[in-house]
Amino acid sequence: MTEAVIVDAIRTAAGRKKGMLIQTHPVDILAPILKELVNRSGVDANEVDDVVTGCVTMTSEQGGNIGRMAVLAAGFPVEVPAYSLNRMCGSSQQAIHNAAQTILAGDADITIACGVENMSRVSMGSDMGSFSSELVDRFNIVPQGFSAEMIAEKWALSREELDELSLESHRRAAESADNGDFEREILPINVKKENGEETFYQDEGIRRTTSMDKLASLTPSFQPDGGVVTAGNSSQVSDGAAGLLLMSREKAMQLGVKPRARIIARAVVGEDPVLMLTGVIPATRKVLKKAGLNLEQIDAIEINEAFASVVKAWERELNPDMSKVNARGGAIALGHPLGASGAKLTTTLLHRLEDKNGKYGLQVMCIGFGMATATIIERL
């Protein structure tokens, strides 16, 4: 039976809002990832059957099928096709699923799954207009931050709990950066600056000097009177790209390329679009069932820290060993470049599994309007 295996996984560092990547076109953030995936694996780009790209705000510089634009900018043969997809925050995780499914179906031997978002240049929501009247008649659609507040209220989560999770995210991220834990997964890229070019290789969002006092001083972003969700316990506006090279196990053996992991289960769920962000709970249960595993068997977990309340509600329901969860920090510290985040987290998950000699890794991500994606990989 055909298996979809991960041969390589890399990402750029995550740029902060209007930071190092502000002058870099999103295509030029993704193209180096594509080049490096084929160059360092020794794969001939001609053999890539398809490139699947996740991107959320597909307008302006990110419109026009950005995946195809990046393939051409990377110098791939024109015969290499690409398409772009939007499952909101789960976009590049869905790209991984689609790329794997194409291999499992026998339609491809080699695929690339990737994602990109330059939120500094293409603002979140700039691709949206008004909601349909039939939609709003059925559902009281609210901004995600209000959903995060609803989650905090439903699970009786205190401001202190959310800020503690945020502080720990920054602490873990800083420690991991200092220990060189991200060096294998981050591809340094040259970026345009006013005085020429600079090499960008470090995540910009880590706040080493934050504290509970500093976090407590922030005004709630969505409910100023009594709310608990702040900029400090929410993910950051970020820029970046990430990508994975996938093959059938047979093709990897034929090319003499060592597979690093195999994708053993994939899941996507729908959930209440008003509460919106709680799909991570049923998605985790669904993907574990598909894999025939329980949470105790998972060695490393990446859950997107869109909001601290999402992670805390998930923790309350599933009771995971939190030392395994976002062990190198999460999106509160490391950023959430929307369409790139799924591939970014899978990249971190794979490297974490390798570094700790773990076997199974779980990735799960909440998605706007009430969805979630989940993936389980097995290190080989």
Language model feature labels by segment:
Residues 1-24, 212-278, 282, 289, ...:
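Condensing-enzyme catalytic core mediating Claisen C-C bond formation in acyl metabolism
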Residues 10-12, 22-23, 29-32, 40, ...:
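N-terminal extracellular/periplasmic Venus flytrap/periplasmic-binding protein-like
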Residues 26-41, 66-70, 95, 144-151, ...:
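Short, well-ordered amphipathic alpha-helical segments that serve as non-catalytic structural scaffolds
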Residues 55-108, 139-146, 209-236, 317-344, ...:
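Conserved catalytic cysteine-centered active-site region
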Residues 185, 193, 264-333:
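Active-site pocket-lining segment
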